Amino acid sequence: MVMTDPIADYLTRIRNANMVRHESLEVPASRIKKDISEILKREGFIRDYEVIEDDKQGIIRVFLKYGKNNERVISGLKRISKPGLRNYVKANEVPKVLNGLGIAIISTSNGVVTDKEAREKAAGGEVLAYVW
């Protein structure tokens, strides 16, 4: 089966594993998934991730993060720009997610960054996803 939207698949796997409180999950590796994983780790939404090299494309193992009473750190994930309908924003139109409580992941010419970093660098780009 051909995967038409690997980013949506990645976010869905995280959402599903989070809903059933799995400790970790594995996804096929790609550069953009590594960049998204790095942002999620840096912003405190996941505990860690590791890239496992194999003879093919590799695997990313994501370790999910939960609170003291096993409450979820990730409340929601939403794919914004889709293959059939891309969503681009200018530097002055970068969205805020839940008035700053969440993050927007944006693919810019400077790489994949959060909404806050995009505003600081005055860079627009493709809005990949919202995480809150």
From Swiss-Prot:
Keywords: Ribonucleoprotein, Ribosomal protein, RNA-binding, rRNA-binding. The keyword RNA-binding applies. The keyword RNA-binding applies. InterPro entries: Ribosomal_uS8, Ribosomal_uS8_CS, Ribosomal_uS8_sf. GO terms for cellular component: ribonucleoprotein complex; ribosome. One of its GO terms (biological process) is translation. PROSITE patterns: RIBOSOMAL_S8 (PS00053). Gene3D superfamilies: 3.30.1370.30, 3.30.1490.10. Signal peptide: none annotated. One of its GO terms (molecular function) is structural constituent of ribosome. NCBIfam families: PRK00136.1. Part of the 30S ribosomal subunit. Contacts proteins S5 and S12. Belongs to the universal ribosomal protein uS8 family. HAMAP family: Ribosomal_uS8_B. One of the primary rRNA binding proteins, it binds directly to 16S rRNA central domain where it helps coordinate assembly of the platform of the 30S subunit. This is Small ribosomal subunit protein uS8. It comes from Latilactobacillus sakei subsp. sakei (strain 23K). The gene is rpsH.
